[in-house]
């Protein structure tokens, strides 16, 4: 199933869910918001983005934040592809390939050069003799066709693509074009009284026009004896989301006019607060960050610092209120490609569907790529009947919604 059909599948699910609601919830979701804002708060500025990172005009629209507060948001459609740095390389070609000609891998414990030496050492590194990503001639098993990429970049990796290094290409996305994404960013951030692990599908956008994604599903990737290679900038492709970031290494368009002892800004979080590059270990000893990696300074107001890429989590949570899909006016909600099919008058609620099912947005998108509700349910570790019950619809309706899109 290509990206357009995947979006239509999710849209169909959102339509089916409309009668029973799709609100997001979390045990630590904020109960109230802090109405006051720091006088020096850095707010959204279109001028900070690199030329070409934003597609079309930024539109100011009324929006409702997830805590119920009505405000104004900037509706921003990003290019879905970095405009100031080159994507790749990802996988090494052979077991003698050097780090210069390959990307990186991070798994929550460290960042590793994907050179030939790392590939040959995987069995020892992960203490699993099943690992062998290369053939008798020393060539690395790489997903070098679109079919291989789509068969491997999913939770239920096809058997012939296990023990592969997984990489994608722009040409293999729908129409060979980047996947644009529209996000509603509060023009005046509203700090919540408590941190929230909930988020509107992705954590934010970079000043280069790239989605800041949630953590990569490392356990599933390693469980299939695959390496979903990142480039040196911490990004990679998947068929559903296109190019997106899971780690921050300092690439791209940066705003470096911060005060002394501060790192450069590289993006905005979904709640409107700026995101800066990671702090060094030495700098971390001199500051106190909250549970979401944020703090306030006299020059910048409240802002986040990204984790080191090794954490496989650019941000652990959000400290501010954000726009839930379906609560925004203007262009498509977060998670829907600009110009894509509308799910309903409230927009496509990708995170709402995922929240109802108790899975991540990544997991839901990857499961729906299969085009079959029974297969998708198996991937998600449940049954089609259980999914239907949670969504308040029938299994037949679920399958019809997906089947209709695969025949278009």
What are these regions, as identified by a protein language model?
Residues 1-9:
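Bacterial N-terminal signal peptides that target proteins for export
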Residues 16-19:
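C-terminal motif of bacterial Sec signal peptides marking the signal peptidase cleavage site
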Residues 21-41:
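Short, low-complexity, disordered segments immediately C-terminal to signal peptides
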Residues 32-36, 305, 329-408:
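Mature extracytoplasmic/periplasmic regions of secreted or cell-envelope proteins
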Residues 34-221:
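Solvent-exposed N-terminal domain segments of exported/luminal and surface proteins
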Residues 38-52, 287-343:
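Long, compositionally biased interface segments
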Residues 179-188, 206-211, 239-252, 297-312, ...:
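Extracellular/lumenal glycan-associated surfaces
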Residues 221-231, 239-282:
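Short helix-loop boundary/capping segments
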């Amino acid at each position: 199933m290509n990206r357009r059909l995947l979006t239509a599948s999710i849209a169909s699910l959102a339509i089916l869910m409309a009668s029973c609601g799709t609100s997001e919830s979390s045990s630590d979701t904020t109960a109230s918001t802090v109405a006051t804002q720091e006088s020096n708060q850095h707010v959204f500025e279109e001028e900070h983005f690199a030329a070409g990172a934003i597609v079309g005009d930024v539109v100011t629209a009324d929006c409702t934040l997830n805590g119920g507060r009505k405000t104004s948001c900037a509706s921003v459609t990003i290019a879905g592809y970095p405009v100031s740095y080159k994507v790749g390389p990802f996988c090494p070609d052979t077991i003698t390939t050097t780090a210069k000609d390959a990307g990186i891998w991070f798994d929550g414990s460290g960042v590793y050069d994907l050179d030939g030496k790392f590939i040959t050492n995987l069995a020892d590194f992960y203490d699993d003799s099943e690992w062998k990503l290369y053939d008798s001639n020393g060539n690395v098993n790489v997903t070098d066709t679109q079919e291989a990429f789509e068969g491997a970049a999913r939770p239920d990796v096809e058997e012939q693509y296990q023990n592969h290094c997984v990489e994608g290409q722009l040409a293999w996305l729908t129409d060979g074009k980047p996947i644009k994404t529209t996000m509603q960013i509060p023009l005046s951030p509203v700090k919540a009284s408590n941190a929230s692990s909930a988020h509107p599908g992705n954590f934010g956008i970079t000043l280069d026009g790239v989605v800041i994604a949630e953590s990569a599903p490392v356990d599933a990737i390693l469980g299939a004896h695959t390496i979903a290679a990142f480039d040196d900038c911490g990004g990679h492709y998947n068929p559903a989301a296109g190019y997106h970031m899971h780690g921050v290494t300092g690439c791209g368009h940066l705003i470096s006019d911060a005060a002394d002892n501060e790192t450069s800004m590289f993006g905005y979080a979904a709640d409107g607060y700026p995101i800066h590059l990671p702090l060094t270990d030495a700098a971390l000893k001199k500051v106190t960050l909250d549970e979401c990696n944020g703090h306030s300074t006299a020059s910048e107001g409240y802002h986040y610092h990204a984790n080191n890429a090794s954490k496989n989590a650019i941000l652990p949570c959000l400290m501010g209120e954000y726009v839930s899909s379906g609560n925004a006016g203007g262009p498509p909600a977060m998670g829907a490609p600009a110009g894509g099919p509308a799910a309903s008058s409230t927009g496509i609620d990708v995170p709402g569907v995922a929240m109802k099912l108790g899975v991540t947005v990544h997991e839901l998108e990857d499961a729906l790529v299969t085009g079959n509700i029974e297969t998708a349910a198996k991937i998600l570790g449940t049954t089609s009947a259980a999914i239907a019950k949670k969504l308040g619809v029938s299994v037949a309706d679920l399958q019809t919604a997906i089947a209709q899109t695969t025949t278009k």
